[in-house]
């Protein structure tokens, strides 16, 4: 199997983590890549085998208004420093994935600057969508153009143009040759041209064995993007929504239905599972009961898919959009502030334990998913492989819950795999006549190994 089939990702938004200026002043933050390497090493201790870092390349502001695809953002450092960062990750056994922002560019991108200067006679006029010289915009360009999301800061590229396609294909080749990256997260993949993505897959297959393509897709049938001809995976926003709203509404049917639907659509495709990221508010700001962070971490790691952590979420930090700005979701953090977190912070403790278990329990990567019991308040399922099983059990209610279900494999007892975590509570279990009885405290979840 490919490396990404049992990977655990750690997602870093580098401009935020390093405290870079929000508008590109060309001034690097001293020691930015040294800091990023320390966080990648921290991620390795949590069991994260892959680093998704981005946006990374030269831009005017937040990183998604790309100016130069082949120059690391000067606020972070140099190409050579990023090359060394990747090499250090590889030495730890971590893969490195970067953002590929191929749908749009910033206004300072060379081809758009040429369009502004030469207008109707521009060499790169056809690199962009819906250019209209009878229109205008807030920049007073005396022409209008296609954009992403209504923002003229983000100029829409014409992905049907073979020159644009080849420019991006060559960019991928450059990234692999120069930095030795292992894959790309495609920004705004839900609006990328399908034939263009097929071309990206052909290049991915060419540049490096098991080079991984993951797309940012919000809604729809994910198998339209994640399939053998296009992308290996997409962001699982459907599950993300169910994770927090299913707990706020005390409704495990939402999460269970989501998993059934996705398995029916995507079959064996491993979607990219996450609880929060650089675009959505952090769990503590969305959950009505923060005890449910434990439940959601367990779900992300034990349901079918590829688990991930967004930097800082392993400490349970807050993050809420302010006045429409995403910067509060992308804070500058210092590892020194969390030195003893694994020993004192229940959230950190649970993530560290799940990282270890992901490496130790092949059932969590390869095991068949079996739903065992389901109510609005309680949920249990197993991951079964070669006659062995681990069972995840959940209670989202304010009172204890008892559940009973048929054992998925023969067993005479159970082991609580999260019993030693900070904040864990004792549970009551009984194996009898081929069934498992479990009594869980209120608002509690854990992972059991069937033994004997």
Predicted regions and their residues:
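C-terminal beta-strand-rich structural cap/linker in extracellular carbohydrate-active enzymes
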Residues: 430-452
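Active-site groove signature of glycoside hydrolases
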Residues: 104, 168-194, 273, 277
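Hydrophobic faces of well-ordered beta-strands that scaffold small-molecule active sites
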Residues: 8-11, 51-53, 96-98, 184, ...
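Short, well-ordered coil/turn segments that N-cap beta-strands
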Residues: 47-49, 92-94, 180-182, 208-211, ...
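Solvent-exposed beta-hairpin/edge-strand motifs
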Residues: 408-423
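Substrate-binding/active-site clefts of carbohydrate-active enzymes
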Residues: 1-9, 13-49, 56-173, 178, ...
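Loop/helix patches that line or flank the sugar-binding groove of alpha-linked glycan CAZymes
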Residues: 2-6, 23-24, 28, 255-412
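Active-site-proximal helices and loops of the catalytic beta/alpha 8
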Residues: 90-92, 113-116, 187-267, 318-353, ...
